[in-house]
Amino acid sequence: MIQSEFSNIQIISHTIRKDPAMTAKILQLVNSSFFGLRQRVTNVGDAVKLLGRALIHSIALSANLFRQLEHQHPQLNRLWEHSYEVACLARQIVLMQQQSKDMADAAFTAGLLHDTGKLVLSTRLPEKYTQILETTEANNQSEWQAEKQMLGFNHADIGGHLLKLWGLPDHVVAAVVFHHEPTMSMENEFSLLTAVHVANYLVDKLHHPTHVNRLDRGYIEQLALTDALSTWESYSKKPTAA
């Protein structure tokens, strides 16, 4: 069993080393303040062991997708950083709720991929996506609402559909589909969706205090998480939060 695990790590590490950009991205993440490591990690094999296969898989999947598509539209140039910050905070929120590491890792995955639909829109419907962004700015409207108004669906719908095609777990897909409208999910307890919805709001609030995604406070109150929200927000403001 141990030998098998060691072999898997070697295979994953060898695959990553073939891609210099992927190697750089993974080492950047493992050395970020979020993981709080005392010594700098410079070896991909050590990074794989520290992060675990689940997180490495999520990072590799999203980094590859972002690298292919993020420069298709100038508005998306910071999307990787936003997604990473949401992923880190969503993971920490799950841990602060005393949930399992597996659930925390799933929250990281959902956070990292929650805006995947924006990449699809920008490449498949570039002119329409530009109009959506212009409408958002002109009307001080949320991007997902403008998408819904002009297309009949939004980036969360597209992202969820794509993740389902990729075979990601249903709870990860749901967290992506409903991350702007958690009440629509009919969930009645803390979940990945809760973590991603709140993390997305708090990260936006930190970087864009005058134009943030709306927090569904009714949803938070329904789950009796108002006090927890204050704790999560305090944590998000710490330098090590992302």
Language-model segments: which ranges?
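Conserved alpha-helical "signature site"
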Residues: 1-116, 120-131, 136-137, 143-213
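Terminal helices and disordered tails flanking the catalytic cores of nucleotide-processing hydrolases
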Residues: 219-242
